[in-house]
């Protein structure tokens, strides 16, 4: 098995404990592992809300235990039902407390619910009739004002392009298409080409690539 050096690596999408499902590491274990391999930064993510307060404690722990190591843990917010969905008040607090990444709905995205055989009407709506819902304008403004990263999370490819076009028009500079190869998102190769053509960043997760490779192709050319 090949071993790849991890020094200087930045991972913007890591789930840790505590969580509603068991993860491989808790926050402090991840901090120790990151410092050990010389990682530069990690963004911790949760489907249940925010992690910027946890990231703050990780950085305090790192300084006390490891000294002035060149590693920073960053926090984020996911706009699922626990924070009120597209809730600008919750988002602004998270950004003021240091959240650097804003994910659109994940487990509560309408696309996610539909893919798991649940009622999409129970989800958080981000587009309607080919346009963003009005609440998204406040989300874009806050992301722009705080120069945060906006991730498309578990919304559909069609929704992603609508959202990204509108976000760009609103002045959002940092846009990431989240694990587009994962079967829940299921962006086609042509969709990925379009993303690259519009200079959108795409995030590819090891777990999603492994999971997708074990599945039958889902409409990809």
Enumerate the predicted regions with their spans.
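Active-site-adjacent C-terminal substructures of enzyme catalytic domains
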Residues: 102, 135, 142, 150, ...
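Short secondary-structure boundary/capping elements
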Residues: 22-26, 50, 86, 131-135, ...
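Active-site environment of divalent metal-dependent phosphoester hydrolases
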Residues: 17-19, 49-53, 80-83, 109-112, ...
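Short, acidic/polar
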Residues: 22-33, 84-94, 188, 220
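Divalent metal-dependent hydrolysis catalytic cores, especially in the metallo-beta-lactamase
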Residues: 11, 15-17, 29-53, 70-81, ...
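Acidic (Asp/Glu)-rich catalytic clusters
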Residues: 55-70, 92-98, 141-144, 167-168, ...
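Extended substrate/RNA-proximal surfaces in nucleic-acid metabolism proteins
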Residues: 70, 80-178
């Amino acid at each position: 098995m090949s071993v790849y050096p991890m020094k200087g690596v930045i991972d913007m999408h890591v789930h840790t404990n505590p969580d509603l499902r068991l993860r491989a590491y808790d926050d402090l274990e991840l901090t120790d592992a990151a410092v050990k391999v010389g990682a530069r930064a990690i963004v911790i993510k949760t489907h249940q809300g925010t992690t910027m307060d946890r990231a703050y404690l990780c950085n305090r722990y790192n300084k006390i235990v490891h000294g002035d190591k060149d590693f920073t843990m960053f926090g984020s917010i996911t706009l699922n039902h626990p924070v009120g969905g597209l809730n600008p008040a919750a988002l602004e607090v998270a950004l003021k407390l240091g959240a650097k990444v804003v994910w659109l709905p994940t487990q509560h995205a309408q696309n996610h619910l539909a893919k798991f055989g649940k009622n999409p009407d129970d989800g958080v709506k981000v587009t309607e009739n080919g346009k963003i819902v009005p609440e998204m304008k406040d989300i874009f403004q806050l992301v722009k004002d705080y120069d945060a990263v906006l991730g498309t999370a578990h919304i559909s490819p069609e929704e992603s392009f609508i959202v990204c076009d509108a976000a760009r028009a609103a002045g959002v500079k940092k846009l990431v298409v989240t694990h587009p190869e994962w079967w829940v998102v299921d962006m086609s190769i042509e969709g990925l080409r379009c993303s690259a053509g519009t200079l959108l960043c795409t995030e590819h997760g090891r777990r999603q690539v492994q999971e997708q490779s074990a599945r039958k192709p889902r409409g990809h050319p």
